[in-house]
Amino acid sequence: MKVQHKKELKFYCIVTIPSAFVVLTVISFLLQEITFPVTASAFLNASWHNLLFLIPFGLFFYPVHIWMKREFGRWNDTEKKRG
C-alpha cells in the first residue's frame, strides 16, 4: 500500500466515518427517530441503526474511492497527452 493510501485511510477512519456518524445522528433528531426528552434507549437505538448503515457504507465507499481516483487519473493523463 502506498504512503498516500495510508494517509487517506487514516483520514477516512478518523474523520470521515465519525463525522458521518454525527451527521446521521443529527438526521435522526430531525426525522424524530430520537424524540425529546432524549432517552438513552432511543439514542442508543438510533446510534445502532446509524452504525448498521455506516459499516457497509464504509466497506463499500473507500475501495470505490480508490478505484475512481485511479480511473479518473488515467483519464487526466490521456487528456494531457492529447492536449
UniProtKB/Swiss-Prot annotation:
GO cellular component labels: plasma membrane
UniProt topology in membrane: Multi-pass membrane protein
Keyword terms, alphabetized: Cell membrane, Membrane, Transmembrane, Transmembrane helix
Tree of life domain: Bacteria
Transmembrane segments: 11-31, 48-68
Subcellular compartments: Cell membrane
The protein, known as: Uncharacterized protein YxcA
